[in-house]
C-alpha cells in the first residue's frame, strides 16, 4: 500500500513532464489538415506584421529588378526572355506558397500551445493531491541538505539565470519559445526581453532573500553572500 502511494506521485510527475510533448504531437497531427483547409478556403485577407511585410517586399523588389533587367537585355532571344518570365512567375508563386505555409504553421503551433496549456491546467487541478505529496518530498529533501550545499545550489542557479553569460542562454530560450509558437523571429523584441528578464529575476531574488531567507535561515544567507563575494 505504501509503495502504491509512493508510485502514484512519481507516475504523475513523469506524466507532467511528457504530457506537453504528447499533446503537442497529437494535436498537431489532428489539426494540421483542418487548419490548412480552413486557411486555404475561407481566409480572404492576408495579415502581415512589419517583419513579414519587409521580407515580402524585399523579395518582390528582387523580382521587379529582374523584370527591369529583362527590359534592358533586348538583344537576347525571345526564347531566353520567355524562360526568364516563366522563372519569375515560378518564383512569385513559390514566395506566396512559403508565406501561406508560414501563416498556417503559426496558427497551428499557437492553437496547439493554447490547448496544451488548458489541458495541463486542468490536469494540475485534478492532481492536487499528488502535487501536495511531491511538494512535501521536495521540502523534505531541501531541509536535509546542509546550508553550504543550499548556498552553492542557489549561487549556481542565480549565475545560470542572471549571471554574466546568461543573456546568450536567455536569447536561445526566448528564440525557442518564439519558434515553438510559430512567430516570426524579431531581433528587437528578443533583445528587449533578454535585457529585461534577468533584471526582473535579480530583483525578485533579492527581495526573496531579504524577506524569506533572512527569517528562515540567516546562516544560509551569510554563506550565500560569502560565496558570492
From Swiss-Prot:
Location in or out of the cell: Plastid, Chloroplast inner membrane
Keyword set, alphabetical order: Antiport, Chloroplast, Hydrogen ion transport, Ion transport, Membrane, Plastid, Plastid inner membrane, Potassium, Potassium transport, Transmembrane, Transmembrane helix, Transport
Transmembrane helix is among the record's keywords: yes
GO annotation, biological process: potassium ion transport
Pfam families, per the entry: CemA (PF03040)
GO molecular function: antiporter activity; proton transmembrane transporter activity
Membrane topology annotation: Multi-pass membrane protein
Transmembrane segments: 7-27, 107-127, 189-209
Cellular component, GO annotation: chloroplast inner membrane
Physiological role: Contributes to K(+)/H(+) antiport activity by supporting proton efflux to control proton extrusion and homeostasis in chloroplasts in a light-dependent manner to modulate photosynthesis. Prevents excessive induction of non-photochemical quenching (NPQ) under continuous-light conditions. Indirectly promotes efficient inorganic carbon uptake into chloroplasts.
Reactions this protein catalyses: K(+)(in) + H(+)(out) = K(+)(out) + H(+)(in)
InterPro entries referenced in this protein's UniProt entry, alphabetically: CemA (IPR004282)
Protein name (database record): Potassium/proton antiporter CemA
Main location: plastid
Protein family membership: Belongs to the CemA family.
Protein biosynthesis is among the record's keywords: no
Top-level taxon: Eukaryota
